[in-house]
């Protein structure tokens, strides 16, 4: 996500903050801001953020370095949807069976494209860190049983759900981690439970 060069850096940064936060559901890091607006110095970005805060456009929590709130977005009326958090996945049982659901989680509806057949799995482990999916994240999944090569999916392998990138090739399915320290999972077949459509991360 790169901001056009036809505005000053402060405006570019503010526009990027809004775009990124609307898209991801959480604010960008200072380094991500640097990359988006072609600045090399993180201290320059911090200076712009201070000026935006003085103007009342953003609010930063001094106790949490990455915690940043965009006042404009906070003031928008947010329609919330409830998404079930699935604690376990069992072969032969519908993913949203009552006994599988641990809790419900509310998120603004604008964080996802729709609220049809969504569920949440809590990410455990670091096998997908190079795709920006971290341990403890809440993975928002659209329930579906088919996938296209390159999709990040939830697959059921030996009665255990795993989040990996999907590839079908040479009569086999490759479930590819996004971490060079992990080997791909190669299987003849597997059950696809859904496709990743969003990540929610608390700071």
Swiss-Prot record:
EC main group: hydrolase
Residues carrying the site annotation Cleavage: 91-92
EC id: 3.4.21.88
Active site residues according to the UniProt entry: 127, 164
Any one Gene Ontology molecular-function term assigned to this protein's record: serine-type endopeptidase activity
Single biological process term from Gene Ontology: SOS response
Pfam families the UniProt entry points to: LexA_DNA_bind, Peptidase_S24
Catalytic activity annotation: Hydrolysis of Ala-|-Gly bond in repressor LexA
Keyword annotations of the record: Autocatalytic cleavage, DNA damage, DNA repair, DNA replication, DNA-binding, Hydrolase, Repressor, SOS response, Transcription, Transcription regulation
UniProt KW Isomerase keyword: no
DNA-binding region, residue range(s): 30-50
InterPro entries named among the record's database cross-references: ArsR-like_HTH, LexA, LexA-like, LexA/Signal_pep-like_sf, LexA_DNA-bd_dom, LexA_repressor, Peptidase_S24_LexA, Peptidase_S24_S26A/B/C
HAMAP family (alphabetical): LexA
Subunit details: Homodimer.
Functional summary from the UniProt entry: Represses a number of genes involved in the response to DNA damage (SOS response), including recA and lexA. In the presence of single-stranded DNA, RecA interacts with LexA causing an autocatalytic cleavage which disrupts the DNA-binding part of LexA, leading to derepression of the SOS regulon and eventually DNA repair.
Family, per entry: Belongs to the peptidase S24 family.
Protein name: LexA repressor
Source organism per UniProt: Clostridium perfringens (strain ATCC 13124 / DSM 756 / JCM 1290 / NCIMB 6125 / NCTC 8237 / Type A)
Species lineage: Bacteria, Bacillati, Bacillota, Clostridia, Eubacteriales
Encoding gene (name): lexA
């Amino acid at each position: 996500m790169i901001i056009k060069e036809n505005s000053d850096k402060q405006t570019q940064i503010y526009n990027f903050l809004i775009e990124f936060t609307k898209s991801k559901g959480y604010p960008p890091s200072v380094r991500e801001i640097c990359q988006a607006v072609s600045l090399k110095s993180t201290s320059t970005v911090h200076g712009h953020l201070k000026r935006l805060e003085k103007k009342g456009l953003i609010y930063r929590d001094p106790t949490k370095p990455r915690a940043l709130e965009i006042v404009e977005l906070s003031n928008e009326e947010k329609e919330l949807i409830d998404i079930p958090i699935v604690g376990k996945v069992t072969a032969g049982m519908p993913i949203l069976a009552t006994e599988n659901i641990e809790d419900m989680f509310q998120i603004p509806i604008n964080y996802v494209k729709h609220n049809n057949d969504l569920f949440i799995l809590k990410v455990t482990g670091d096998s997908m860190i190079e795709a920006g999916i971290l341990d403890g994240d809440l993975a928002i999944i659209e329930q579906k049983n088919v996938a296209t090569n390159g999709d990040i999916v939830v697959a059921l392998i030996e009665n255990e759900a795993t989040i990996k990138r999907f590839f079908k090739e040479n009569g086999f399915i490759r479930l590819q981690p996004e971490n060079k320290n992990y080997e791909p999972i190669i299987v003849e077949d597997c059950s696809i439970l859904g496709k990743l459509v969003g990540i929610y991360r608390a700071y």
